[in-house]
């Protein structure tokens, strides 16, 4: 049994894992789920974590037991190991009595595990069961940082982060070919290259963006010693050509708002953008293989009176039910819906324009 420890956006991490398992043909069976981790029975390899954008740790579960039996467990020499605890803070006191190296906040970050070369064990509180085991794989934040900050062209205030781009690539389930028709500086293309997708098509209506993408993709090929066919050209996403297996993209999300606006203004912006998105989806229908996926980021505006969403039904496509393999009682208890918002704060403040991750299948 294994546990996958989620990043900050647990629903996004979960959606990525399920899509990744399906794409890679990983046979798995559900065991338990919390907002911190997914427990599964499966054949897992530690290197898998390098292919994921939203998983922080993989833990090999050695034992599981009822909450009330925590103090009866024999943890052997592991009591001298550093431990991370995911779940109820009410049980921290009991864990502290058993383990000598209990961190102040209850969790050792993946950054510290990599930086300080620490080996640890984890205790995960599920719905009714405790799961205990050794961490066998850790996501390396310095790899993502290199992929972001070392490339020649950067636009931190606008570009999607490499970890989020990798999640989009995995949600698309692309194996042989992928397209990003709003490529910007090429972050999604870069992650597709690192994922080993052999044919990558990038385009943008902005000629500067095309040049930026070319520079960044050339750098990525050299820096990570990757080969593959990468075609980058100036093109309007409303007039696509060619043929592709899947699309992963973050289109224009509208103006970068600094403060909340009225619902009327928010709907006006969303309405303008929706026209662009509809035209893109119509165009994509002609190049996307039947059954192929579009993994896309859409904007949600935090207006003064509440959230304003894009109308998410597009002709010729069906939304993918990302969580249908999660048992219904868990979906009900954890309030899992097909809406995945990335509301990570920006410089300590709530974002006005929030990313919504959506996946569609061509029919």
For each predicted feature, which ranges?
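Class I S-adenosyl-L-methionine-dependent methyltransferase catalytic core
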Residues: 1-53, 58, 62-64, 89, ...
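Generic structural signal of hydrophobic/aromatic residues within well-ordered alpha-helices
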Residues: 48, 70-71, 95
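A short N-terminal interaction module
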Residues: 75-130
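Short amphipathic alpha-helix with an adjacent loop that forms part of the alpha/beta core around
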Residues: 68-75, 239-243
């Amino acid at each position: 049994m294994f546990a996958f420890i989620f990043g900050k956006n647990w629903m996004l991490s979960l959606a990525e894992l399920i899509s990744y398992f399906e794409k890679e043909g990983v046979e798995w069976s559900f065991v338990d789920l919390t907002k911190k981790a997914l427990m599964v029975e499966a054949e897992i390899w530690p290197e898998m974590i390098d292919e994921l954008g939203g998983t922080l740790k993989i833990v090999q579960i050695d034992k599981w037991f009822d909450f009330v039996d925590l103090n009866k467990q024999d943890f052997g020499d592991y009591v001298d190991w550093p431990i991370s605890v995911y779940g109820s803070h009410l049980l921290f006191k009991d864990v502290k009595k058993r383990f000598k190296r209990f961190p102040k906040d209850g969790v050792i970050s993946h950054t510290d595990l990599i930086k300080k070369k620490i080996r640890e064990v984890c205790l995960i509180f599920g719905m009714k069961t405790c799961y205990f085991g050794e961490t066998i794989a850790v996501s390396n934040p310095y790899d993502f940082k290199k992929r972001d900050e070392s490339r020649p062209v950067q636009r931190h205030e606008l570009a999607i982060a490499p970890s989020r781009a990798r999640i989009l690539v995995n949600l698309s389930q692309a194996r042989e070919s992928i397209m990003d028709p709003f490529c910007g500086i090429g972050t999604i293309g870069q992650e597709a290259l690192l994922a080993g997708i052999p044919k990558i098509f990038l385009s943008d209506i902005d000629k500067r963006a095309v040049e930026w993408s070319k520079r960044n993709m050339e750098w990525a090929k050299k820096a990570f010693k990757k080969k593959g066919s990468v075609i980058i050209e100036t093109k309007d996403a409303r007039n696509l050509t060619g043929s592709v297996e899947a699309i992963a993209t973050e289109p224009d999300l509208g103006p970068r708002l600094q403060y909340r606006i009225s619902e009327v203004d928010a709907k006006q912006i969303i309405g303008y953008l929706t026209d662009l998105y509809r035209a893109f989806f119509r165009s994509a229908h002609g190049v996307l293989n039947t059954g192929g996926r579009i993994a896309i980021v859409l904007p949600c505006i935090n207006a003064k009176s509440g959230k304003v969403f894009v109308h998410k039904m597009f002709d010729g496509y069906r939304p993918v039910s990302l969580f249908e393999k999660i048992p219904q009682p868990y979906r009900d208890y954890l309030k899992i819906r097909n809406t995945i918002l990335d509301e990570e704060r920006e410089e300590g403040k709530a974002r006005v324009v929030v990313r919504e991750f959506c996946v569609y299948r061509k029919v």
